[in-house]
Amino acid sequence: MRYLSFFFEFFFLFSFAFAFDFDVTSDDSINSALTTVTDGMLNYYQSTSHTFTAYWWMTGAGLNSMTDTYAATGNTTHLDMLISALVANKGDNNDYAPNSEKFDLGNDDQGIWGLSAMSAAEVNMTTGDSSASFTELAQAVFNEIMSRWDTSSCGGGVRWQIYSFNNGYSYKNSISNGILFQLAARLARYTNNDTYVDLAQKVWDWSTTVGFVDLDDYTVYDGASVTSNCSSITNEQWSYNVGVYLAGTAFLYNYTNGSSVWQTHMEGLMNKALDYYFTSDKIIYEPSCEPTESCNSDQTAFKGMLARFLGYTMQLAPYTVETILPYIQSSAEAAALACSGGSDGVTCGYMWYWNNGTWDDHYGLGEQISAVETFQALLAQQSATILTLDTGASSESNPDAGTDDGDTVTITPATKSDKGWAGFLTFAFSFVFLLFSIWLYF
């Protein structure tokens, strides 16, 4: 098996440099590129489990990219598979906390799926399941994460992880809180319910007060530990963090009919994103890992999410197209050149600015997601309207979704006893796994 694996890797990595012709001004060319890179992404899909072969949150992100593509092109080729996967992963309680993932689940993981469900609702996709609509699935995710708002440290905010025995429980981060903010903004607009605006404002005020979002220049930092009461902010910056807040402000700008407050925040985040996460040639990249070629399998998808959120911004605030679109066009041109690897000649790498736009020998689901999201963002002006219940959406709302299943997690600070048991269980499971591995080896 090891020899077979070696030869498979060798064959896959060998590039014939086929690439594909691409014209950012041609809808036909963009649609063709989307078909190519989506097919490459689906090479990682397992129909039996309805997941991609990656971390579970990336299945949610990948499915969202397919929903975005459906909205942009109207292509229904993969629509049945897309809906089936979104429904299959929702869990018994209709909250994207399935038993298979529950004890590894972070607020960001569950939230990514909530965004995917919200995207499905906004393009009028239906679950075909009477137990919950896509809107209800998004509301359940929102309500459960909101119920974990933790005032025992940092004056509020939600933690990265849900359970105290998971690494990262003592960390509050921008992506978890930014997703909560964006979901509130989207639900406000979709349902025409100002209660969600108030909740979005609550998350925004906390994020800016604690310093995750710096209103001086709209830098969005990764997060902080509760052990310092969030007084020591992590300086790392990731593209999806600024993107998730940007899209939230764009939805609120649109919902409030051009509020100058949300316009100011939207423009600040937009300008920060374009200035920091694009090269001088206007090519999107991840400055925290791409220059050192150290991006992990999660991080390769981050810039694709930023491209998605920039696309939403162009749809919701059309005057931003003149500013944003040239960056998306340059990035898409670079991506087309960089999607020239593998045995098929069209596998995508992640460093699109690298070596005159040739393949960088990297491949994976994240690379494909980023290419899909960047190509579809080119079609933001032609994409289907982001619907609401007042403009033709039919996905039913249930503000109480996720609050009555008896399984909502309420976070309380871990006691010494909790931490002790968590440490013991971690050791015990590790020891059993080690013994099992030794048994398999011999």
From Swiss-Prot:
Topological relation to the membrane, as annotated: Single-pass type I membrane protein
**Where in or outside the cell?**
Endoplasmic reticulum membrane
What InterPro entries has UniProt attached to this entry? 6-hairpin_glycosidase_sf, Glyco_hydro_76, Mannan-1_6-alpha_mannosidase
Q: Lumenal side: which ranges?
A: 20-421
Enzyme Commission designation: 3.2.1.101
**Where the protein is mainly located, per its record?**
endoplasmic reticulum
- Gene3D superfamilies, per this entry? 1.50.10.20
The transmembrane segments are 422-442
Query: What are the recorded GO MF terms, alphabetically?
Result: mannan endo-1,6-alpha-mannosidase activity
Q: Which residues form the signal peptide?
A: 1-19
Question: Could you name the Gene Ontology cellular component terms for this entry?
Answer: endoplasmic reticulum; endoplasmic reticulum membrane; external side of plasma membrane
Q: List the glycosylation sites.
A: 75, 124, 193, 229, 254, 257, 356
Q: Which SUPFAM superfamilies match?
A: Six-hairpin glycosidases
In the record, biological process GO terms are: carbohydrate catabolic process; fungal-type cell wall biogenesis; septum digestion after cytokinesis
Q: Does the keyword Transmembrane helix apply?
A: yes
Keyword Transmembrane recorded: yes
Keywords recorded for this protein, A-Z: Endoplasmic reticulum, Glycoprotein, Glycosidase, Hydrolase, Membrane, Signal, Transmembrane, Transmembrane helix
The record lists the catalysed reaction(s) as: Random hydrolysis of (1->6)-alpha-D-mannosidic linkages in unbranched (1->6)-mannans
The family note in this entry says:
Belongs to the glycosyl hydrolase 76 family.
Name of protein:
Putative mannan endo-1,6-alpha-mannosidase C1198.07c
> What taxonomic lineage is listed for the species of origin?
Eukaryota, Fungi, Dikarya, Ascomycota, Taphrinomycotina
